[in-house]
Amino acid sequence: MEKQVQISDSTINYEVFHRNIKYPRMEFKTGRLLLILPDNYKDYNDIVEKHKDWIYRQSSKIAKALEEAQNKRLELRRTDEEFKKLLYSFVEDISYELKININSIYFRRMKSKWGSCSRNKNLTINTILKYLPDNLIEYVIFHEMIHLIERKHNDHFWKIIANRFDNYKEIETELFEYWLLIQERMKPIQSEGNMYNNLPQVTR
């Protein structure tokens, strides 16, 4: 069910979903507000009203990020083979640096992550990472492989990240902007005969 709410100078679209959950929650997915309610919960207007300041702040943040994203360029000409070669090179270098071995690398469409790394040392890469600049691909791989040292995003984790990427906060912001850019520009694009067909709706 699609709705709208007017907050200050912004008209914000949102969707209401009912699920088998205990408590209501709100989340933004690539610029769109989702209101997820328990099956028997009806008063969604009350929740929106109570959290309108938070909704406005998040919506403004996303709008600003999307504006910044318009100046960025996607690597549309990079082939699957070129992407894999680059990625394997980064994995090899980072493995040597961290003294960590990766067992397997998988590629698949992921709706909410750039990648993941399991306790079994399996690295899963979101196929849309192909369209990012080299330095961001390297950062994502390093970020995921650090989870073999520290599973949580705690102070220890970010200290390790900062030792190699002292500007990691700016990089994280840039990655968020690329999420939005891909959502806006890449969803309609399909290239026949490769594993990047039917790009997912990117979420963050």
Label each residue range with its predicted role:
Residues 1-139, 148-204:
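Active-site-proximal or metal-binding-adjacent scaffold patches in catalytic folds
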Residues 144:
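Walker B catalytic acidic pair
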